Amino acid sequence: MTMKKALLGAALLLSPLLAMAGNWPVTVKDMDNRTVTVTQEPQRIILQDGRDILTLAVLERDNPFAKVVAWNNLPKKQDTETWNVLKRKWPEADKILDMKFSDQGNVDLETVISRHPDLMIAQLRAKPSLVQSGVLAKLEALHVPVVFVDYELHPVENTMPSIAMLGKVLGQSDRAQDYINFYQQRLDTIHQRLAKVEKKPLVF
């Protein structure tokens, strides 16, 4: 099972909890080791990689799309099974601006800015293109905080810290920790089972 499938499964299976109030401003270190301050609770979020909606589904379980104003709808393009699950549960997802934000930085930035975003969540792998295209500089000039998460370049080291960071930014640290515990328990179970498997000699 991929990490993104695990996130979706957890979002749908974990029992709903009361959201804990966050305190803003909050300052975090993102997965690019940048210090980012978010001055208020994000209400208008851009997703550079639409698959990160699965993380929001863990943190904002009632409706992960409620605060998303623009995204690159990769689930629709690349994973129709996941997209159909998301669309059935949250039909409004199909109405959110699909900005077709590629890793090459291609995007109609003016249209995105017209949505008045107050946070962009981006994958670390896309940073070079965001810098080269000027997207990062433009958003920073408009005082729109950008945080980089990473589930692909260094998944072992950065996946859980990415979720913890977003939990803090979104005022959902308890839910982030809830998922991290859920993930760690299952990872420990796998390790325990593997430790009991007898090593067999290699046959050439």
Question: Can you name each region flagged by the protein language model?
Answer:
Residues 20-204:
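N-terminal ligand-binding lobe of clamshell/alpha-beta domains
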Residues 1-10:
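Bacterial N-terminal signal peptides that target proteins for export
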